[in-house]
């Protein structure tokens, strides 16, 4: 079984021990690469942003487990040099995949801004995700945490990543393997990042549905796109 997940530290509890498990090949890569590999069928499952999961034909979502931000995100932000409502050009995180969609949906839904994509030298703002958040950029002095913006708007948790399985993958075995990895990881990992939850309960699912409604209005979902759970 071939499983892919981003290299970000907050993902560690969900893949705890998988690299050492017989019959499992674990690929840690950038979100954009994981999406491509799942679309090509070279992975059986990958941890993806919800909008990316919908870009995989007939993918199924493993319920109950994911990356959830109940409040602030800290690892996902918009850096800007103008007020958010005035952003006309934005530089995306080229490796961030569907995490860029979250920022662009918030700009459109909360601030009425639908900026075009630009290189960083001409941009009014840039989207930073994962490890890139650690870098300061004096050209964009204002930092806006995506989790905080989302929570202020909706009062709901944000589901940042879900386990997406390709069509034809061994679903029962995959659910067992991923569930056991999460149980081990949450029991044995002591340095879990504070803003992150790994359980997709009722409130998180409400947040996920709200986000996909917004993303659909903004044109970020494929036609007829809907998450299908396994």
Residue spans of the language-model regions?
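Domain-level signature for soluble enzymes in the chorismate/prephenate branch of the shikimate pathway
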Residues: 1-230
């Amino acid at each position: 079984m071939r499983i892919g997940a981003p290299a970000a530290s907050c993902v560690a509890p969900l893949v705890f021990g998988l690299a050492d498990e017989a019959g499992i090949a674990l690929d840690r890569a950038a979100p954009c690469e994981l999406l491509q590999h799942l679309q090509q069928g070279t992975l059986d499952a990958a941890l993806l942003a919800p909008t990316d999961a919908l870009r995989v034909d007939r993918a199924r979502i493993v319920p109950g487990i994911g990356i959830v931000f109940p409040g602030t995100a800290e690892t996902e932000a918009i850096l800007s040099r103008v007020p958010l409502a005035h952003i006309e050009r934005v530089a995306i995180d080229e490796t961030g995949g569907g995490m860029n969609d979250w920022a662009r949906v918030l700009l459109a839904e909360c601030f009425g801004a639908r900026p075009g994509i630009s290189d960083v030298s001409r941009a009014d703002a840039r989207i930073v995700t994962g490890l890139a958040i650690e870098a300061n950029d004096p050209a964009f002095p204002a930092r806006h945490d995506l989790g905080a913006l989302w929570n202020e708007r909706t009062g709901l948790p944000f589901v940042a990543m879900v386990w997406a399985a390709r069509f034809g993958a061994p679903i029962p075995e995959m659910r067992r393997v991923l569930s056991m990895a999460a149980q081990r990881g949450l029991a044995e990992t002591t340095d879990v990042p504070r803003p992150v939850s790994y359980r997709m309960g009722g409130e998180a699912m409400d947040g996920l549905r709200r986000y996909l409604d917004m993303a659909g209005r903004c044109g970020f979902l494929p036609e007829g796109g809907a998450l299908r759970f396994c």
